[in-house]
Curated annotation (Swiss-Prot):
The active site is at residues 158, 162. GO terms for molecular function: 4-hydroxy-tetrahydrodipicolinate reductase; NAD binding; NADP binding; oxidoreductase activity, acting on CH or CH2 groups, NAD or NADP as acceptor. Keywords: Amino-acid biosynthesis, Cytoplasm, Diaminopimelate biosynthesis, Lysine biosynthesis, NAD, NADP, Oxidoreductase. NADP(+) binds at residue 38. It comes from Edwardsiella ictaluri (strain 93-146). GO terms for biological process: diaminopimelate biosynthetic process; lysine biosynthetic process via diaminopimelate. Homotetramer. The keyword Oxidoreductase applies. Pfam families: DapB_C, DapB_N. This is 4-hydroxy-tetrahydrodipicolinate reductase. Pathway: Amino-acid biosynthesis; L-lysine biosynthesis via DAP pathway; (S)-tetrahydrodipicolinate from L-aspartate: step 4/4. The lineage of its organism: Bacteria, Pseudomonadati, Pseudomonadota, Gammaproteobacteria, Enterobacterales. CDD domains: DHDPR_N (cd02274). PROSITE patterns: DAPB.
Amino acid sequence: MAEQIRVAIAGAGGRMGRQLIAAAAAIPGVTLGAALEREGSGLLGCDAGELAGCGVTGVTVESSLERVAGQFDILIDFTRPEGTMAHLAFCQAHGKAMVIGTTGFSEQEKATIEAASQHVAIVLAANFSVGVNVMLRLLEKAAQVMGSYCDIEILEAHHRHKVDAPSGTALAMGEAIAGALGRSLESCAVYTRLGHTGERAPGSIGFATLRAGDIVGEHTAMFADVGERLEITHKASSRMTFASGAMRAAQWLGAQQPGMYDMCDVLALDTL
């Protein structure tokens, strides 16, 4: 694959799509090859750079991957599960790698993505922020030391338009903690509390969700004991942190063989 990675951005008109276009235009080693929106969108035919507010790029927004198949090496997809799955089928058939930031997949959809990774290289992550992925490693360490005797709660807050809850990042936090404790998240997660719930179940991991205003993303894991409490928090103030991480993932993915990867692989966190 050429040193200059050509990327296509799915969902070009969305909040993340525009940030991804701007990042592709600004980051050395990456070229914006294509931008995509759904059929019937009023944005079709627009210049992608002007749409993102970063100047003319000469790349027009299209509705069909077929029409731009020769213009990109890697598809970056932060859309919705149904759209991502359609894009996945195309990329598998045409040998295109994918960076997937979509969340809310069903177990069957996750299995389909895993199967596709036998044929094309895929980075799948709930969050592309470097800070969040470092936090996941810190949570594993905290859980190993404190998780056996502390109450563990995960709190997350996002903007009013987010459609899935808990966030993919919150679930990844829970999975990191549960894994460090030798448990499955499914066996210990508590997602709702309403009415007379009784005392907190020992060993459970609780989740709390807020949706309000324009919050980009805030996540906190709490390890609470009697007399002290440890909180590990990440706050994102701009979606550009996710977009920059996605470009970093795309650059790394260009040199990889087919397989399923995550941001820990991209950042080589397992070697630290």
